[in-house]
């Protein structure tokens, strides 16, 4: 499941650069679904750092701050999962 999430992060980054808002919304929904499945499979990852990353991810997405969203995905979530 980690590979699915990491692939989805790459897909979202590509969409951010293409500025396709519909595709971004769809890809973000898939990412969230994949993260829920990952948490179910790997209970240990539910810790303070992961929760903080999710808050940052939600904040960036809600504000539609694509630069911040890309930063959280590339420099916080991706390294955490690798």
Language-model features: locations:
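C-terminal-biased regions
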Residues: 1-82
């Amino acid at each position: 499941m980690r590979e699915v999430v990491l692939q989805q992060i790459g897909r979202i980054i590509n969409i951010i650069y293409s500025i396709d808002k519909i595709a971004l919304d769809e890809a973000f929904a898939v990412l969230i679904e994949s993260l829920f499945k990952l948490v179910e499979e790997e209970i240990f990852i539910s810790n303070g750092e992961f929760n903080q990353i999710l808050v940052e991810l939600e904040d960036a997405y809600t504000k539609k701050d694509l630069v911040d969203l890309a930063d959280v995905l590339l420099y916080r979530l991706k390294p955490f999962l690798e």
